[in-house]
């Protein structure tokens, strides 16, 4: 049986879900996302929606959808086995998103796209996505700087 957490063709396959699917799916999706991020980071072509934002949106959507199913099932169908697997994977997911939110190269690429002439040709929804990402990066990076400063002050 295929892993239902890796099936994005329709509605979630909750009936096929088993706790042992979680780590396999999350590991595969994180590996996919990290490979994509490395490709996006190393791409020296001018930044566009198609070569930068869209691939990231697609990859993060798959990870978010799979983890969302796990979180939902942990809330409504909690069992000792699922709780253990959920708790094992939560730090890995958290670490990935923390790294993503503090990635200066990705932040620079969003800034380049915002300054690019293509930005004015994008739909208002896509412009809003880019602007929201820039705001999020600024906030997350500022929060990180405050933590670093507080740690330095505490020494």
Name these PLM-found stretches:
Residues 1-155:
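Zn2+-dependent metallopeptidase catalytic domains
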């Amino acid at each position: 049986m295929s892993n239902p957490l890796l099936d994005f063709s329709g509605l979630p396959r909750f009936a096929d879900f088993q706790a042992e699917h979680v780590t396999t799916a999350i590991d595969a999706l994180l590996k996919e996302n990290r490979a994509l991020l490395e490709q996006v980071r190393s791409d020296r072509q001018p930044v566009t929606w198609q070569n930068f934002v869209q691939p990231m949106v697609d990859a993060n959507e798959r990870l978010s959808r799979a983890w969302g199913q796990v979180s939902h099932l942990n809330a409504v169908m909690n069992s000792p086995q699922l709780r253990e697997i959920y708790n094992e994977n939560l730090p890995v997911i958290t670490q990935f998103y923390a790294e993503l939110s503090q990635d200066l190269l990705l932040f620079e690429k969003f800034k380049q796209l915002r300054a690019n002439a293509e930005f004015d040709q994008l739909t208002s929804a896509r412009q809003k996505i880019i602007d929201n990402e820039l705001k999020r990066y600024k906030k997350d990076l500022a929060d990180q700087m405050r933590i670093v400063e507080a740690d330095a002050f505490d020494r």
